Amino acid sequence: MGVLARIQTPDDLRQLNSAEMKQLAAEIREFLVQKVAATGGHLGPNLGVVELTLALHRIFDSPADPIIFDTGHQAYVHKILTGRKDDFDSLRKQGGLSGYPCRAESDHDWVESSHASASLSYADGLAKAFELTGQDRHVVAVVGDGALTGGMCWEALNNIAAGKDRSVVIVVNDNGRSYAPTIGGLADHLAALRLQPGYERILDSGRRMVKKLPWVGRTAYSVLHGMKAGLKDAVAPQVMFTDLGIKYLGPVDGHDEAALESALRRAKAFGGPVIVHAVTRKGMGYAPAENHVADQMHSTGVIDPITGRGTGSASADWTSVFSAELIDQASHRQDIVAITAAMAGPTGLAAFGEKYPDRMFDVGIAEQHAVTSAAGLALGGLHPVVAVYSTFLNRAFDQLLMDVALLKLPVTLVLDRAGITGNDGASHNGMWDMSLLGIVPGMKVAAPRDTATLREELDEALAVDDGPTALRFPKGTVGDDVPAVSRLDGVVDILRAPSGRNDVLIVSVGAFAGLALAAAERLEQQGISATVVDPRWVLPVPESLVKLAEDYTMVVTVEDSGLHGGVGSTVSAALRAAGVDVPCRDLGVPQQFLDHASRAQIHAELGLTAQDVARQITGWFAGLGNLRPEQQNGVVADLDAQRAEKQQG
């Protein structure tokens, strides 16, 4: 029996000797590779925190001592050690193990962290609560993967430092590759110099001496200066944290479990706020991840566990289409610049940065700063494009409203992963954006349905110079283009226009065009005539769409976003404002936190399939009392089928 098979709770870890701990770390890495390869997930970050998580659970008494993982995708090892290893075959699947900490799964999961930079604020609040209620507990926050670039961390640190007697242990999981050169005698010598008061003076003296030498000396200085710059981040935390009044321990080798235990034991005994700086390597122990240049296999789909290569299709996705089009636009518009918040690869801006390095700005995990910095770029005469995941726009709403929209600045937001994203759970669904954007004065929002309209609408957004614009598109592959039959007033695309009766006008939003067309075909079989339109620009509601609605018995909107404040509600409001007395119904995502599952499974649960949409519209249409004799049989039969299904369910 292997060591991992004997681990059911953190208490079991404390019975192991040094050799068994090393064996356990190796077994956990093998387990992670095999399981994540089959389900997809965050592989690289978890391979990098194996020893760190083992040490945390050996030194601290979870769940009495909360261990809070910032950007909780690095909590897989924590889950393995807290009784959930047998559930990993269901990782990120419907009804299975969440890819993030989950309070419903275990008492060891205090929060459901997945958005970065929040762990220190949680820790600050918990420590204050324990102090006020007389509980002698330690609070641990594990923060890494760039989360310290988020301003919220520094707001929290400012407050944590004031609690001199509160035991808050902040573990900085530093897996940046800038520490790769810090090995050998030179690294040891520079580390010793850093601890001396005259470190900077000695470096300055050395710089002057070396630069006086022939050109070789200048080259040598450049190399040494580069090494210093690469290592500077190892010095800065100590200075910054100790100046705040927080004790600093480290850097510690994040893959030396014994050294980590020693540092954590000292931190625990200190009795006040402490930083433990652990230097780790993302993807540690798995060659395909260690050698993955882009991000050490930060997040993967299903892969071959031997080669690390993906097994999915290579079809074009929304992100790559946007990336190519933005590069093309920038080739003939020098005013276009791009901004991302530590998501250059996932949002498609990495290629833009390679092509136009001086026009690309990665600001770290700082969405608030990204948007207001974009405002500054716009004030300077440029047209910034801010590409973020839809769910992360929530963090920058005030900046969008007050720093961009109030000034009527031409800033374009590109919201990737809009709508239901699925496997990453409630925190990553991009279902809130329309509700937020809809209340911003002067905001214009486009929802492309395919490759052609994405390119077209990005071009149109970049032409707007009197206010903010946004494009939203979903996760995944694009699919075939959905051609329009005609375009109304140069704005609204007519995708389906049956001759004769005008029963139902279906307003499809973005990539739901295919769904709307399939539902319309089903309605036709019931004798209900359905026209399908794509407004393209969903905010503000096009006047031509409002005028078109006058001719129909009923209007139905179908969208992959929240119903409250979504496209449906804005269309209804526009119809009322124009005095158009036509019933308007909306189909979309209810305003609730949705459990993780595939996008298709969630859409099915929400009734956002062609069959369900057609049935819902059939019921509404019948309820209006407008059925003609020739429609009765088909509609009645369909309603009977719905009742039978409900009874069986």
Curated annotation (Swiss-Prot):
Q: Does the keyword Transferase apply?
A: yes
Taken from the UniProt record, the cysteine pairs bridged by disulfide bonds within this chain are: none
Annotated SUPFAM superfamilies:
Thiamin diphosphate-binding fold (THDP-binding), TK C-terminal domain-like
Q: Which residues bind thiamine diphosphate?
A: 73, 114-116, 146-147, 175, 286, 367
Q: Which Enzyme Commission number(s) are listed?
A: 2.2.1.7
- For binding Mg(2+), which residues are annotated in this chain's numbering? 145, 175
Enumerate the Pfam families for this protein: DXP_synthase_N, Transket_pyr, Transketolase_C
GO annotations of cellular component type: cytosol
Q: TM spans, by residue?
A: none
Which cofactors are named for this entry? Mg(2+); thiamine diphosphate
The record lists the catalysed reaction(s) as: D-glyceraldehyde 3-phosphate + pyruvate + H(+) = 1-deoxy-D-xylulose 5-phosphate + CO2
* Superkingdom in the source lineage: Bacteria
Its pathway is:
Metabolic intermediate biosynthesis; 1-deoxy-D-xylulose 5-phosphate biosynthesis; 1-deoxy-D-xylulose 5-phosphate from D-glyceraldehyde 3-phosphate and pyruvate: step 1/1
InterPro entries, sorted: Dxylulose-5-P_synthase (IPR005477), THDP-binding (IPR029061), Transketo_C/PFOR_II (IPR009014), Transketolase-like_Pyr-bd (IPR005475), Transketolase_BS (IPR020826), Transketolase_C (IPR033248), Transketolase_CS (IPR049557)
Q: How is the cofactor bound?
A: Binds 1 Mg(2+) ion per subunit.
Catalytic EC class: transferase
Task: Tell me the protein family, please.
Answer: Belongs to the transketolase family. DXPS subfamily.
Q: What is this protein called?
A: 1-deoxy-D-xylulose-5-phosphate synthase
Task: List the lineage, top down.
Answer: Bacteria, Bacillati, Actinomycetota, Actinomycetes, Mycobacteriales
Instruction: Name the encoding gene, please.
Output: dxs
